[in-house]
């Protein structure tokens, strides 16, 4: 079987599918995965997405926690960017219809 595409994305995790969604507006995109599209490490992680979404939480705390979890090997500028972009990314995923866990009509937030 031959498939013609502008962009081939290998992997159906969060990064691959985000790239596919963004590129699909202007390119013909194909996604391939070694298993079912929903069978990625991202889908199996079930740990949620770390983001500052409520009062009393802070970007600084998330950056610090991430740096500690990464044994200080993380690029602090990348960590800061990801933490700052996370609330917008979650909003975008909600707009796309991603079914996040919720309680009483609000996102389920855990610590």
Spell out what each predicted region is:
Residues 7-31:
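N-terminal Rossmann-like FAD-binding beta1-loop-alpha1 element of flavoenzymes
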Residues 34-111:
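Conserved N-terminal/central alpha/beta ligand/cofactor-binding core
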Residues 2-5:
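Core beta-strand elements of the Rossmann-like FAD/NAD(P) dinucleotide-binding domain
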């Amino acid at each position: 079987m031959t498939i013609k595409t502008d962009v081939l994305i290998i992997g159906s995790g969060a990064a691959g599918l985000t790239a596919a969604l963004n590129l699909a507006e202007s390119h013909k995109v194909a996604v391939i995965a070694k298993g079912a599209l929903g069978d990625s490490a991202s889908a199996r992680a079930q740990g949620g997405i770390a983001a500052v979404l409520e009062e009393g939480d802070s970007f600084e705390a998330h950056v610090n926690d991430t740096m500690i979890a990464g044994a200080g090997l993380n690029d602090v500028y990348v960590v800061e960017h990801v933490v700052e972009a996370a609330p917008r990314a979650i909003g975008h995923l909600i707009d796309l219809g991603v079914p996040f866990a919720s309680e009483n009509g609000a996102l389920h937030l855990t610590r």
